[in-house]
Amino acid sequence: MLTPIIRKFQYGQHTLTIETGMMARQATAAVMVSMDDTAVFVTVVGQKKAKPGQSFFPLTVNYQERTYAAGRIPGSFFRREGRPSEGETLTSRLIDRPIRPLFPDSFLNEVQVIATVVSLNPQVNPDIVAMIGASAALSLSGIPFNGPIGSARVGYINNQYVLNPTSDELKESSLDLVVAGTAGAVLMVESEADVLSEDQMLGAVVFGHEQQQIVIENINSLVAEAGKAKWDWQAPAVNEALHARVAELAEGRLGDAYHITEKQERYAQVDAIKSSVVETLLAQDETLDVSEIQDILGSVEKNVVRSRVLRGEPRIDGREKDMIRGLDVRTGVLPRTHGSALFTRGETQALVTATLGTARDAQNLDELMGEKTDSFLFHYNFPPYSVGETGMVGSPKRREIGHGRLAKRGVLAMMPKPEDFPYTVRVVSEITESNGSSSMASVCGASLALMDAGVPIKAAVAGIAMGLVKEQDNFVVLSDILGDEDHLGDMDFKVAGSRDGITALQMDIKIEGITREIMQVALNQAKGARLHILGVMEQAISTPRGDISQFAPRIHTIRINPDKIKDVIGKGGSVIRALTEETGTTIEIEDDGTVKIAATDGEKAKFAIRRIEEITAEIEVGRIYQGKVTRIVDFGAFVAIGGGKEGLVHISQIADKRVEKVTDYLQMGQEVPVKVLEVDRQGRVRLSIKEATAPEAGSPAPEAE
C-alpha cells in the first residue's frame, strides 16, 4: 500500500502542498508540489560515483511543460511535445542557478533534476512551484546538498509588496521579481521592473526572502520524516604538501601575470606558467595526478586575484574598484538597417541592430499559460570568435537565450505602447568581443539602436555588471567586472535602468553572509556606474530620431466601420489579396475596424488608403457610378461599382427599348455608367444603365475598380 507523506501549508494567498513516497520510487528522490491546482512533479537522480577524470560538476536541470496539464493537445504535426521552448529553457536556468552553489566544491558526481508540469492553474505560474520541488527533492535525496532553499515571486502593487501574485495581479504590478535562498542567505534574484528605485528593489528582495522561510521550515520537517540517509561521501583530503609546493612555484609568477592588462596576452602567460609548474612537478614525481595539480593551480590563481582586490590594490586591468572601462559609442554604423549601434566597453563589444516590422511580424507564442503575441523581440548571439576561440555555430544555447531575455527585460519598460507606435520591433545583439558583461553591453547597444531607428523609447537605458569579493568582514564591491572577476568573485549582479530607476536586476550569490548592507552598497555603486555610462551614451544620441529610416515600412492607420470589414477582406480573402498585390503594401485589419497599411513608399500607402475608402464608402441611391460588367446572365448583368460591390442591372434597365439578348448590348469587362435605383435590407443593389444614360442624368462618379 502506497502511503504518501505530505506537508500542506499556507504560502501567501495560496495553499502549497509537498508530497513524497507515491511516485517514481526508483529515482533517488521524487516530490509532487502543488500550489492551487498548479502541480509540478520533480525527480532527482544522483550517481553514487563520479566518472574517472571528471573535472567539473555535471548537474543537469530539465524543466518540461506537458500540454495535458492545461487540458490541451500539442498543435505540432506529430501532436506531441518537442524541443524545449524558450520559456522552458529560462525556467531550467532559474532552477539551476540557486541550487548549483549549494553542492560541495569537490562533489563531481552526476546529478539530474527533472521538473515536469502535470497540472496548470493559469493564475499560478509553475516556475516557483518547480523551484520549491527541486529544493525538496534534493533535500530528501541524501545527496550532499547544503539546502534546502525557498523561492518566492514578489510583485509591487499600489506601493505594497505582494507575495506570489497571480497572473492577473502581475499585469497591474510594476515589479516581477523572483528570489531564492537558504534560511540565512539570498542566492539568486531575477527581475524586471517599471523603473523602481534601489531601495524599492532591495526591499522586494528582503521581503521575498523573509516570506519564503515557511517553505524551508516545511521542507526540513518533511526531510526529518521521509528523508533518505545522507550519502557516505567525503571530500577528498587536501594534499597540503603538494598545495604548498604549487603555491611556492606559481604564486609569485601568477601575481606578475595578473599585472598584464590585455586579456589574450594575460591568458597566454597564465597558461604558460601553469604548464611550467605541471612539468616541473611531474619531473620530480611522475606519480602525481595532473588534474589534482591543475585544481590546486586554479585555487592559487583565485587566491592571488582575490587577495589583491581585498588589499585595495589595482584590479587585473589596473582600474580602481569603482572605475568603468573606456567607452566608445557609435550609432548609424550600418547603412541599410533601420537602426544600429556599436557599443564598446573595454574588451567587450556589441554590434546591435533594430528592425521595424508590422503586426504580421510579431511572434505568436502558444505557451502553456495561454496564447500571447510578442511585438518586441530581443535576440542575443555569442559567436566563438568573440573570445578568440573556434566552435560550433548554430541554434542559440541556454546561455544566449538567458542573456537575451535579461537584456530584453532591461529595455522593455521603456518601449512605447502599441497604440503610440504600432510596429513590431526586433533587436539583435551580436557580441563581437567579450571580456565580461556582454548582456549589459547589449542593453546599452539596444537603447542606442532603438533611438537611431526612431523608436520613441521613454528614456535611454544602460546596464552594468557588478562583482563582490568577501573574506570574513572585509569586502570590496567591483564595478564593471571582467570575465575573470566574475569567475573568481563571490557575487555577480547585473543592473539595468534609466536615470530615474531600475528596469532589470539579476543577482547570483555564491556564498552566505551577503547582508542587506552589502547589497545596498553594491546597488548604490551600480547606480553611479549606470549614470556615468548614460552620460557617455547621451553624447552620441540623446533622444530618438525624429523619423524612422527610409528603408523601414511606414504604418498608416485609418478606421473603418466594423460592418465593412467583410467588404475589405472579401470572400476567402480575395479582395484584400488583390489590394495587397495592386498597391504593393501590407494591410492588416483588426476587429474594431482599425486598418494598418504598411509601405516603404508613401504614394503606395496613399493609393491603398484611397482604395479602402472607396470599398467602404456607402452606396448612395440616385448616384451614378462608373462600373464594370463582371457577369452576364439571362435576366441581366452584374456590374461592379464602388470598389468591389456588385449590383444587378435587370434586362429591362439596360436600354430604353426592349432587349431580347443581353450580350447584344453588353460584354464581359465592359465599362458602363450605372445609376443606383435601390439598396434593399439585405444589401443587394439594383442598378440601371437606362437611367444613367438618359439626357437628364449627370456625369458618373469616378470608377472604383
Curated annotation (Swiss-Prot):
Required cofactor names: Mg(2+)
Gene Ontology MF term list: 3'-5'-RNA exonuclease activity; magnesium ion binding; polyribonucleotide nucleotidyltransferase activity; RNA binding
GO BP annotations listed: mRNA catabolic process; RNA processing
Catalyzed reactions: RNA(n+1) + phosphate = RNA(n) + a ribonucleoside 5'-diphosphate
Family matches, as PANTHER family: POLYRIBONUCLEOTIDE NUCLEOTIDYLTRANSFERASE, POLYRIBONUCLEOTIDE NUCLEOTIDYLTRANSFERASE 1, MITOCHONDRIAL
InterPro entries assigned: ExoRNase_PH_dom1 (IPR001247), ExoRNase_PH_dom2 (IPR015847), ExoRNase_PH_dom2_sf (IPR036345), KH_dom (IPR004087), KH_dom_type_1 (IPR004088), KH_dom_type_1_sf (IPR036612), NA-bd_OB-fold (IPR012340), PNPase (IPR012162)
Lineage, highest ranks first: Bacteria, Pseudomonadati, Pseudomonadota, Gammaproteobacteria, Enterobacterales
Listed name of the protein: Polyribonucleotide nucleotidyltransferase
SUPFAM superfamilies tied to this protein: Eukaryotic type KH-domain (KH-domain type I), Nucleic acid-binding proteins, Ribonuclease PH domain 2-like, Ribosomal protein S5 domain 2-like
Broad EC category: transferase
Similarity annotation: Belongs to the polyribonucleotide nucleotidyltransferase family.
Domain S1 motif: 622-690
This enzyme's EC code(s): 2.7.7.8
Chain positions recorded as Mg(2+) binding sites: D486, D492
Residues in KH domain copies: 553-612
CDD domains found in the cross-reference section: KH-I_PNPase (cd02393), RNase_PH_PNPase_1 (cd11363), RNase_PH_PNPase_2 (cd11364), S1_PNPase (cd04472)
Subcellular location field: Cytoplasm
Keyword list, A-Z: Cytoplasm, Magnesium, Metal-binding, Nucleotidyltransferase, RNA-binding, Transferase
Biological function: Involved in mRNA degradation. Catalyzes the phosphorolysis of single-stranded polyribonucleotides processively in the 3'- to 5'-direction.
GO CC term, one of those recorded: cytosol
Subunit structure: Component of the RNA degradosome, which is a multiprotein complex involved in RNA processing and mRNA degradation.
